């Protein structure tokens, strides 16, 4: 595969970690970074020093060097993801969306537009390959279980609770058990919504998610307990730092370069479907 030129959108913790990983891989080059804070973003103050990589404060500014960008890799905020995808599609630029915040209808609309306009794209809110494998195994095991409890831990700076990965694990396990109702009224919550609750329970399937936000940084975990009569299966994923996302992004790009089209999640790129 030719060297891939990327633009990183979001120069915070995740974007900075992935930047560092890209700098170590000769198969990729970083054209620019986009962050609303410009030169004051974390990436600009740390890993970009001495690299000669330009920092823009808006995607439209980065499009001035679009000929040197093969893929936009987006780690922006949930509030920005939909608008950002519209900008990429409007500019006919390939993208890997790694931020959460899109609902089902928006994902379907984005995929439909990309396929119609032959724009390569992917929506992978969790780019950690082993986290995706964990969810895959959870889904396989779910029909054989009575109770499922999902526990996830992120540091206190994470904006949403539960995480998108934990919520998606609940949805996939519930579907595997024959449940397809996922409106707000179908959950018992400790907070104001399914995106702002440290405890949620899917009423019909009984699957629970417990979210923890300790005053620490670094390690994130998801711990899934699957119970049946007199037995328990535990599937745990631990991410030691955010550089774990780089492998998933690489797999998505390799898949799209070979096959074109659009990816919803990493499963196809990992050969799981």
Residue ranges, per PLM feature:
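C-terminal substrate-binding/catalytic lobe of Rossmann-fold NAD(P)-dependent oxidoreductases
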Residues: 5, 9, 13-63, 146-273
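Hydrophobic beta-strand scaffold residues
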Residues: 30, 55, 95-96, 121
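N-terminal Rossmann-like NAD(P) cofactor-binding module of classical short-chain dehydrogenase/reductase
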Residues: 70-73
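ADP-ribose/adenylate-binding Rossmann-like module
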Residues: 77, 84-107
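Rossmann-fold dehydrogenase core element
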Residues: 94, 109-127, 146-151
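Rossmann-fold NAD(P)-binding glycine/threonine-rich loop
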Residues: 99-121, 132, 136-137
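Rossmann-like NAD(P)H-binding beta-loop-alpha module
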Residues: 132-145, 161
